[in-house]
């Protein structure tokens, strides 16, 4: 049983977002009861997977819409082992747990009849499609890693782990959800093989993966080719990420940190999506994210962080990330990790690889 314990929140510019780690033990009786009751409505799509809705007010058109969006993810023979997708309006395992893929093994092979639970489903929840893509990523990877490499549970023994350089990080599988190897792999599926429509979700634009301290999937040499060779599938039609821009810290004042970068290019010729975010870990069980406003002057983009806000929040160092995403959801980033006691040291510094902040 594998679960995704992430809270996603949309915020206005320069507002702090707190993402609490861990899983709540509070259980909602209504959702548990729904497990043993007939769904309010069902719809079986073209792949044979059934959407089972326990959400009041959802009609057949809504279920068809969710299935159509689900089908935009990269899907192969592994779909035959997925039976259904449950939609629940509440959070039986706490609000940090928004989805689960239910795995089971028979004679060291994935068993048929697997299913996905989605929690907190409703018209006011924009994250359902992102969660569904992530949970299907679990299904996808468990199937192919087992079929091609004989892997059941220990992803660190896989070729994937080698290409992703997971052995370079002491935090891997330390109990923190974002450092779980299986969760990192599912996030990679979303980025490389997920639905291009995820770009419509604002939180996906600035958080294409849960772990902000690892390179994005498109930044890892050979990772896309590995997914292709593992599954025999090619993913999205657009299989190129944007060019990586140069992020620079250009000015430090008592009031703020000021950044800029030049407009970058993409093979599609379509407009790119730029996001700036500051990430830090003030305590071991929480993450603070600062969404930063962006302005454009000619071909130059600018953004800033309020030093007063950082002081009020007692932030000592921060990872500033520029994320550039094309219209298919392919993303790259540049990052500057700044010690706020001496930010002037980072003027015009070449962006460094992402590092884990403690």
Name what the model sees in each region.
Residues 233-267, 332-358:
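Pro/Thr/Ser/Gly-rich low-complexity, intrinsically disordered linker/stalk tracts
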Residues 264-289, 315:
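Solvent-exposed loop/turn segments flanking beta-strands in beta-repeat/beta-sandwich domains
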Residues 53-109:
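Auxiliary, metal-adjacent structural segments of Zn-dependent hydrolase domains
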Residues 136-154, 197:
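Catalytic Zn2+-binding segment of zinc metalloproteases
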Residues 20-34:
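Sec-dependent signal peptide cleavage junction
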Residues 93-129, 142-143, 262:
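Active-site scaffold of zinc-dependent metalloenzymes
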